[in-house]
UniProtKB/Swiss-Prot annotation:
Intracellular or extracellular location(s): Cytoplasm
Protein's recorded name: Cell division protein SepF
Compositionally skewed regions (Basic and acidic residues) per UniProt: 22-46
Gene designation: sepF
Family stated for the protein in its record: Belongs to the SepF family.
Positions of the UniProt region annotated as Disordered: 22-54
């Protein structure tokens, strides 16, 4: 068994389809159990059945929705379009090098508020370049230190 096969089995990514057994409840038969036992048993069966159905998650639907948008706004008016992409849960990389510094600052302020409102994140990834992400995208690490060191060593 190769590494790839073990990996797929661990994360349940095998191509085979698992058969799920469904239990059909039979009509209740009258028996002489005390009232407390009768009341608890059907609820426990129902709860166990619901827990099995709630544990199934489709990973393919999560993977298809990830998109990243690259934008280079020319004016502050385009900030709302960028915010709309974030509201649709798409990550956005914004290049502000071709816009006046005052307007670039206003765009960053606007997007900072947008990102805060949706629970996302904004990070500077280079001079005049920002990454804005919604709450479904996690940013790990930092390349700003690396960019700073590279520009210091070349100057």
């Amino acid at each position: 068994m190769g590494f790839k096969t073990k990996f797929k089995r661990y994360f349940n990514l095998d191509d085979h389809v698992e058969e799920v057994e469904r239990y059909v409840e039979e009509p209740e038969q009258r028996d002489e159990r005390p009232a407390l036992e009768k009341g608890r048993a059907p609820k426990e069966k129902q709860t166990a059945g619901m827990e099995q159905n709630q544990n199934i998650v489709s990973l393919q639907s999560v993977q298809k929705s990830a998109k990243m948008i690259l934008l280079e706004p020319r004016s502050y008016d385009e900030a709302q379009d960028i915010a709309d992409h974030l509201k649709r849960r798409k990550a956005v990389v914004i290049n502000l090098l071709r816009i006046e510094q005052e307007q670039a600052l206003r765009i960053v302020d606007f997007l900072s508020g947008t990102v805060y409102a949706i629970g996302g994140d904004i990070q500077k990834i280079g001079p005049g370049i920002f990454l804005c992400t919604p709450d479904n995208v996690e940013i790990t690490g930092s390349i700003s230190d690396w960019v700073t060191r590279q520009t210091d060593s070349t100057v």
